[in-house]
Amino acid sequence: MALRTLASKKVLSFPFGGAGRPLAAAASARGVTTVTLPDLSYDFGALEPAISGEIMRLHHQKHHATYVANYNKALEQLETAVSKGDASAVVQLQAAIKFNGGGHVNHSIFWKNLKPISEGGGEPPHGKLGWAIDEDFGSFEALVKKMNAEGAALQGSGWVWLALDKEAKKVSVETTANQDPLVTKGASLVPLLGIDVWEHAYYLQYKNVRPDYLNNIWKVMNWKYAGEVYENVLA
């Protein structure tokens, strides 16, 4: 995943580790790494009619940009709290770091998961990932049906994922609430595809009919990228 990460200070190696790890990492931190908003590889309107240019512009320039800004702010505050030995402030900042950091991680994957139809978006998966989907779900159509059902049924805001368990070497459908990244469901899970089911991802175009958004997003899904991630992880 090509993220434009600005390493303005020393690296802080969290926040999405296992139980107890975020605080331990914070306690030993000597600096932070801020992040920047990644560029899109296509124009805002390139995914129409599946996703409108207006939605893409707002989603990228406003929503994702806000997660980036708030994550960086929280990391700066964390650095100050650690330097002062303020354990209470460190604990309080964990929620903001997880939410905004998760928002940045999830959206950075999401943009890579999309591709204009003219550039191959929507073409079904081939090769090893295609075979894995057939083996674990029965067919590509069955996978789409399951992800649509899981995404439509997700209460509130969140994400529906096609995940690879790199230990079991199986693909599965997972959901996460709010901006929780997939790794919070299991350290061995790697995101292949993520679909944002927050209302900001579809409401301006599809209103409250989330299933229509889910049905149409497959027309611009970048299965080539998902297949490359799958093969690289299992190489």
Swiss-Prot record:
GO terms for molecular function: manganese ion binding; superoxide dismutase activity. Belongs to the iron/manganese superoxide dismutase family. Residues 1-31 form a transit peptide. The gene is SODA.4. Its cofactor is Mn(2+). Keywords: Manganese, Metal-binding, Mitochondrion, Oxidoreductase, Transit peptide. It is found in: Mitochondrion matrix. Binds 1 Mn(2+) ion per subunit. Its main location: mitochondrion. The keyword Oxidoreductase applies. It catalyses: 2 superoxide + 2 H(+) = H2O2 + O2. Mn(2+) binds at residues 59, 107, 196, 200. One of its GO terms (cellular component) is mitochondrion. Pfam families: Sod_Fe_C, Sod_Fe_N. It is an enzyme of class 1 (oxidoreductase). This is Superoxide dismutase [Mn] 3.1, mitochondrial. GO terms for biological process: response to herbicide; response to oxidative stress; response to reactive oxygen species; response to xenobiotic stimulus. Homotetramer. Its EC number is 1.15.1.1. Destroys superoxide anion radicals which are normally produced within the cells and which are toxic to biological systems.
